[in-house]
Amino acid sequence: MYKKILLTVYLCISLLQVGAVGINKNNNIKNDDGFTTIVFDRANSPVPYRIPAITETRKGTLLAACDFRLSHTDVGWNNRNGLWQINIVMKTSKDFGKTWSDTVCVARGNEHAADPVRTAFGDPSIIADRTSDNVLLHCVAGKSAYQTATRQNPQHAYFFHR
């Protein structure tokens, strides 16, 4: 029960962070000045970006993360070629979203990992602590799909801390 309450609070905080800047249906971020910037450009990438997350650090830096789905499918599913890999990529902005850094992979899935949990990382959410410079990135991981997960073969929650 405690885990469900904690997860609900965590998701609500994540959604509030996204709503503070505003993401439209095309994955664009629009700020209060009215300009729109494409953060992760799906039009020029053969690999789909999905599930965006955004937060602002104590110093005003925007952190935007999303899935980079090399498998072209969700965590726990493989494509026709047997590829499972999904990475989480991130960009930063120090000018409230007018310009963005190059894309950096912050969680790299590994098709050949000895531990199947490290095969894919996806569905990111980010929390930035307002009193420190700590950032927490949460995601799901592994080869188990949400729909088929069991206690013996779960879909894992992963946390990265900076």
Which sequence ranges carry the predicted segments?
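Asp-box/BNR beta-propeller blade signature and adjacent active/binding-site loops
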Residues: 23-162
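Hydrophobic h-region of N-terminal signal peptides that target proteins for export
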Residues: 10-19
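Bacterial N-terminal signal peptides that target proteins for export
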Residues: 1-9
